[in-house]
Amino acid sequence: MKLKTNIRHLHGSIRVPGDKSISHRSIIFGSLAEGETKVYDILRGEDVLSTMQVFRDLGVEIEDKDGVITIQGVGMAGLKAPQNALNMGNSGTSIRLISGVLAGADFEVEMFGDDSLSKRPMDRVTLPLKKMGVSISGQTERDLPPLRLKGTKNLRPIHYELPIASAQVKSALMFAALQAKGASVIIEKECTRNHTEDMLKQFGGHLSVDGKKIIVQGPQKLTGQKVVVPGDISSAAFWLVAGLIVPNSRLVLQNVGINETRTGIIDVIRAMGGKLEITEIDPVAKSATLIVESSDLKGTEICGALIPRLIDELPIIALLATQAQGVTVIKDAEELKVKETDRIQVVADALNSMGADITPTADGMIIKGKSALHGARVNTFGDHRIGMMTAIAALLVADGEVELDRAEAINTSYPSFFDDLESLIHG
């Protein structure tokens, strides 16, 4: 796919698609609750559609009509054995969280995904689930998909310290803990996104959170709810960066989720000197309107507890850093290596091929700015965030063309991305 290049300004206002993390969880909680759940503004990307289909395969009635998802919950013990293996597509969130959901189901399932998912380690989830009494295994010692799982009605509670900062592992264990008899204690390495905790309370569940320690008493019952999904800050991040680095630009992003566990990119933009305004804050929905303008940027250091708050935004932050004066250092981000691709290497290769100066490290990158970008051919390797990062980088290219291979990967999280880009170019 040939990308738009040499764009002189971006203007306009858009609503980004619904938050991917909240969309996944709304389907899961709605399915496990008793009674009806209605979900508004859900993301209809490929990953979320995979989760929706999996729960249909598990016997849950889910209707998508007039822009509203209606779920007839079956309760914590109401899932049915599927006729066939469960297809998770490209979605690491789906396979990990649903492994926890099925921990208390007394039937056997196989879960598989595409080529990319089949390279992602699941031992981070399988090891603690085995401690709870689940029979679960995959391929190689890292438990790569496909996974075979047989849950148990006699699920044991767990006391577990996460060796990595992972909201997916935490959430999988919370879903399992809801079905165990007794109190489970989950201790995070660093605080990660807390959508599962927030939504558990919304659906009538109970938990105790004390810093990095989460206690879930099981078993519990949940009750169907109305869920309004805010815009995804991970999708908004591409426009935040575009508005900062494309000259003569001003972008207004409406209804963006600003959950405090997800706003690391806002901290980074401010540390780099970017012009960013937050208005129309809704404290209940945890959403706001974000306004950015073209800015002169300076390098910064991104590390430690900040990393889990922006892990998915690091590819586009790397592009932002190529347009800042000085050096930006990203470290403590080894988790990037086991995303849809090895995002440390793939980001560095993609942007360096366009003229950036990025040195990959074991746990991050060293980025020297400011770089003039030129044309190149870039492969997403099936990673949606690499595709969108490259499309934003291409806007700065004055010399040559930018070809993007496997651009369809963007449909994973943002099917209307190129439509929104066109509207901002012509705004």
Curated annotation (Swiss-Prot):
<keyword id="KW-0808">Transferase</keyword>
<feature type="binding site">
    <location>
        <position position="166"/>
    </location>
    <ligand>
        <name>3-phosphoshikimate</name>
    </ligand>
</feature>
<dbReference type="GO" id="GO:0005737">
    <property type="term" value="C:cytoplasm"/>
</dbReference>
<dbReference type="InterPro" id="IPR023193">
    <property type="entry name" value="EPSP_synthase_CS"/>
</dbReference>
<feature type="binding site">
    <location>
        <position position="21"/>
    </location>
    <ligand>
        <name>3-phosphoshikimate</name>
    </ligand>
</feature>
<feature type="binding site">
    <location>
        <position position="385"/>
    </location>
    <ligand>
        <name>phosphoenolpyruvate</name>
    </ligand>
</feature>
<feature type="binding site">
    <location>
        <position position="20"/>
    </location>
    <ligand>
        <name>phosphoenolpyruvate</name>
    </ligand>
</feature>
<feature type="binding site">
    <location>
        <position position="120"/>
    </location>
    <ligand>
        <name>phosphoenolpyruvate</name>
    </ligand>
</feature>
<feature type="binding site">
    <location>
        <position position="168"/>
    </location>
    <ligand>
        <name>phosphoenolpyruvate</name>
    </ligand>
</feature>
<dbReference type="InterPro" id="IPR036968">
    <property type="entry name" value="Enolpyruvate_Tfrase_sf"/>
</dbReference>
<keyword id="KW-0057">Aromatic amino acid biosynthesis</keyword>
<keyword id="KW-0028">Amino-acid biosynthesis</keyword>
<feature type="binding site">
    <location>
        <position position="339"/>
    </location>
    <ligand>
        <name>3-phosphoshikimate</name>
    </ligand>
</feature>
<comment type="similarity">
    <text>Belongs to the EPSP synthase family.</text>
</comment>
<feature type="binding site">
    <location>
        <position position="312"/>
    </location>
    <ligand>
        <name>3-phosphoshikimate</name>
    </ligand>
</feature>
<dbReference type="GO" id="GO:0009073">
    <property type="term" value="P:aromatic amino acid family biosynthetic process"/>
</dbReference>
<feature type="binding site">
    <location>
        <position position="343"/>
    </location>
    <ligand>
        <name>phosphoenolpyruvate</name>
    </ligand>
</feature>
<comment type="subunit">
    <text>Monomer.</text>
</comment>
<feature type="binding site">
    <location>
        <position position="20"/>
    </location>
    <ligand>
        <name>3-phosphoshikimate</name>
    </ligand>
</feature>
<feature type="binding site">
    <location>
        <position position="92"/>
    </location>
    <ligand>
        <name>phosphoenolpyruvate</name>
    </ligand>
</feature>
<comment type="function">
    <text>Catalyzes the transfer of the enolpyruvyl moiety of phosphoenolpyruvate (PEP) to the 5-hydroxyl of shikimate-3-phosphate (S3P) to produce enolpyruvyl shikimate-3-phosphate and inorganic phosphate.</text>
</comment>
<feature type="active site" description="Proton acceptor">
    <location>
        <position position="312"/>
    </location>
</feature>
<feature type="binding site">
    <location>
        <position position="25"/>
    </location>
    <ligand>
        <name>3-phosphoshikimate</name>
    </ligand>
</feature>
<dbReference type="GO" id="GO:0008652">
    <property type="term" value="P:amino acid biosynthetic process"/>
</dbReference>
<dbReference type="InterPro" id="IPR013792">
    <property type="entry name" value="RNA3'P_cycl/enolpyr_Trfase_a/b"/>
</dbReference>
<dbReference type="GO" id="GO:0003866">
    <property type="term" value="F:3-phosphoshikimate 1-carboxyvinyltransferase activity"/>
</dbReference>
<dbReference type="InterPro" id="IPR006264">
    <property type="entry name" value="EPSP_synthase"/>
</dbReference>
<protein>
    <recommendedName>
        <fullName>3-phosphoshikimate 1-carboxyvinyltransferase</fullName>
        <ecNumber>2.5.1.19</ecNumber>
    </recommendedName>
</protein>
<dbReference type="InterPro" id="IPR001986">
    <property type="entry name" value="Enolpyruvate_Tfrase_dom"/>
</dbReference>
<dbReference type="Pfam" id="PF00275">
    <property type="entry name" value="EPSP_synthase"/>
</dbReference>
<feature type="binding site">
    <location>
        <position position="168"/>
    </location>
    <ligand>
        <name>3-phosphoshikimate</name>
    </ligand>
</feature>
<keyword id="KW-0963">Cytoplasm</keyword>
<comment type="pathway">
    <text>Metabolic intermediate biosynthesis; chorismate biosynthesis; chorismate from D-erythrose 4-phosphate and phosphoenolpyruvate: step 6/7.</text>
</comment>
<dbReference type="GO" id="GO:0009423">
    <property type="term" value="P:chorismate biosynthetic process"/>
</dbReference>
